[in-house]
Amino acid sequence: MHKESIMQPICDRELHEECGVFGVVGVPDAANLTYYGLHSLQHRGQEGCGIVSVSKEGAMRRVRGEGLVTEVFNEAKLANLAGDMAIGHVRCSTAGGGGTENIQPFLFHHNTGDFALAHNGNIVNADLLRNYLENKGSLFQSTSDSEVFAHLIKKEVRNHNRPRIYSIIEALNMLEGAFAFLVMTANRIYACRDKHGLRPLSIGKLGDGYVVSSETCAFEVVGAEFVRDVEPGEIVTIDRHGIRSSDYSMFKRHMMCAMEYIYFARPDSDIEGRNVHAFRKESGRLLYKEAPADADIVVGVPDSSLSAAMGYAEASGLPYEMGLIKNKYIGRTFIQPSQSMREKGVRMKLSSVSGIVSGQRVVLIDDSIVRGTTSRRIVRLLREAGATEVHVRIASPPFKNPCFYGVDTSTYEELLCARMSVPEACEYIGADSLAYLSPDALLKAGNRCELCMACFTGNYPTSLYGTIEEANKKEKC
């Protein structure tokens, strides 16, 4: 019999990504715009947030704190962040742990000029670089892997009397992993993306200035017009005079993280030319072709699975119904001390609509199964509401491998599909049948030649270092 942990968050189905970044150059009240931009990226991180602004005199000021954007900032705090240039960050930690000291943007003082830094992703050789830098005398303010990049920049600036962009290029070429960085100095922002293109970063035009964001959904909110994506292996220098491009790596691949399309990004965002909602809807259509079910209605798990459920319903000819309702106001990190309290917590977050599902054979569409515990609870909710059959269809391949690029799955033990076959997983979640989308269909849904699908296939686009490599080689249980 499978036993669930006694202490477990009710929102344990949710994957958490490293964060989201947003920046503004050459626009009045840049901090206010950054506030709205971060609010649009809140789904990428709820643990903490921060903004650093640059005044007309070149002075940098920072406000950061734990909680949501609306909890950390108010009019008085934003008024203290005057200037036409700012960067911001929302955080959901996957490396370095929590605590205010790990909330970005980080702010660094240097005799060549202060600079601020915000990062989305994960640096897989951070521990090796940190040890190297500490042996060279670097003192770290946090346990975040992101701070490693800043110390590499400072080291290169100290050793070479040349423009900062060259120090950034040298530092970037020492990093391995997934990253979208914003580095802000007194008069410009450098937008940098890893050479594999694992994390998104886009540039927009607003009046005489520019904005840069992890997702394009933030552009419409602030009134900006999409210009282009930052390319893999590229540094885009953005100042009050315009934008300039430099390549720091000749090796480039467009290996966007598949989970950006499947789960993390907002449906109204476009990632490398493909709308997220359209991607998910097409994945649902292809899922029906690969795994049809003899059923009466299609129900999606809110919110990230709804687009795929629409596609499955259209392809199958079955009615799409709102058989599950999500309570958006439940706390984010409830941890319940007993089984009965956990069950109440799940019912607070998700409710089944018995008038819709009672007496029906349900196709339940979800974007992914990671740990499996919440899938089992949802199947149980539908059965208790009167569903006669529950056929689970997953709009992604089986999640079998840890991610080391900014998603909080670092061991095989926590992954259901690493421990169980599909029939075993089906029995565990209590479904009548279970099927997944194939990797080929996932690529087809996005009109892509390649994506990072390491969590599905085990084919990692970068080298894995130290303890991470050893963890990856562990025998699967």
Which residues make up each language-model segment?
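Secondary-structure transition/capping motifs at alpha-helix termini
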Residues: 138, 159, 292-296, 314-321, ...
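Mobile, glycine- and charge-enriched loop segments
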Residues: 351-365, 369, 394, 465-477
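Short, glycine/charge-rich flexible loops or terminal/linker lids adjacent to PRPP-binding catalytic cores
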Residues: 317-362, 373, 400-407
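Extended, hydrophobic alpha-helical segments in both membrane/secreted and soluble proteins
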Residues: 298, 305-312, 316, 320, ...
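PRPP-dependent phosphoribosyltransferase catalytic core
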Residues: 172, 187-188, 223-229, 380-477
